[in-house]
Design a protein with these regions (language model features):
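Solvent-exposed, polar/charged alpha-helical surfaces in well-ordered, non-transmembrane soluble domains
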Residues: 7, 22, 43, 55, ...
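Ligand-binding clamshell of periplasmic/extracellular solute-binding protein-like
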Residues: 13-18, 35-39, 178-192
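Soluble non-cytosolic domains of exported or imported proteins
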Residues: 14-15, 51-56, 64-65, 99-106, ...
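Ligand/substrate-recognition segments at binding pockets and active sites
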Residues: 16, 91, 113-186, 229, ...
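Periplasmic-binding protein-like
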Residues: 17-26, 48, 52-91, 137, ...
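Short, solvent-exposed loop/beta-turn-alpha elements that line the ligand-binding surface or hinge
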Residues: 22-37, 44-55, 89-107, 117, ...
Length: 284
């Protein structure tokens, strides 16, 4: 790596494993810039499958999920934000009234009983075989969720597979749950909501929750057609309230993005988008 050589080097968009950032920061020859990335890791719940079509069941699974422990084990303390909405707080229309439910195993079990879900019901989670920006350790993540759901009487079967196979099978709706994520490339809410949660994407896209909510769809369709930023923002806030009430995902994390560089580099500004701007970058 050029980071350990003598030349000027910038390693852009470093999504570290939990132990990477402290070691880079501790190196006297290096420095690290960081910012919130346009990234969300989440678990999509197949709303067209038995049991998961019931919002009470989706709420129960969400209540059983130990988010704080999950992201600290996966990303390390301070390297990711707890996700609430489908996109991070830096994106327009972030609904700050939305909340993840507090972890409550008793209430989760009660919701499952109310929905008629038998003790010991089996669900299958698809996850990838290698880590990435949205989840550095998919197997550990799956095992932690498996342990969480066992506490409310759900047996989670884990299916680990290649990324391409996982996406193909998830598009076919073969999963109950799928652990995945999304990296936005322009900072607009539509760049998250239409590909991941629209009715069209439920039919033939990347809406792995296979969730089609007419109220939500009408709001994001209108927001795409509105020019005024304040009106757009209000529409997205309303759309996210619908999303929050219906719980098609278990949101996990918004990982931070890190850029490592040698200490002789000055003036470089990290960007959450795909472009690099070296106009103000100097080597001293």
């Amino acid at each position: 790596s050029c980071l350990v050589g003598s030349e000027m080097c910038i390693r852009d968009r470093l999504y570290p494993k939990p132990d990477d950032v402290p070691s880079i920061k501790a190196d006297p020859m290096l420095k690290v810039a960081e910012m919130e990335a346009l990234v969300t890791g989440y678990i999509a719940l197949n709303t067209q499958h038995r049991y998961l079509s019931d919002v009470r069941v989706r709420q129960a699974l969400d209540m059983a999920f130990d988010r704080q422990t999950h992201i600290e084990q996966l990303f390390g303390r301070g390297n990711a934000l707890l996700a609430v909405n489908p996109y991070p707080p830096t994106v327009m229309g972030y609904n700050r009234d939305n909340r993840n439910p507090p972890r409550d195993l008793d209430k989760a079990r009660a919701l499952l009983r109310e929905a008629g879900v038998p003790e010991g019901t089996e669900l299958t989670l698809f996850t990838r075989n290698g880590g990435g920006p949205t989840n550095p350790n998919p197997r550990l993540s799956a095992e932690m969720l498996q342990s969480d759901l066992a506490k409310i009487g759900i047996k989670l079967n884990i299916r680990v597979m290649e990324w391409a196979e996982m996406l193909r099978r998830a598009k076919n709706g073969e999963h109950d749950l799928v652990s995945t994520g999304w990296a936005g490339d322009n900072g607009d809410p539509d760049n998250f909501l239409t590909p991941l949660l629209s009715c069209e994407a439920a039919r033939n896209g990347e809406n792995y929750a296979r969730w089609c909510n007419k109220t939500f769809q009408a709001l994001i369709t209108e927001a795409r057609q509105v020019i005024d930023p304040q009106q757009r923002e209000a529409l997205y806030i309303r759309a996210l309230a619908v999303y929050d009430a219906d719980r098609p995902w278990i949101t996990m994390a918004h990982p931070k993005m890190f850029t490592a560089m040698r200490r002789n580099v000055e003036g470089y500004t990290i960007s959450p988008l795909t472009n690099n701007n070296f106009a103000t970058t100097l080597v001293k």
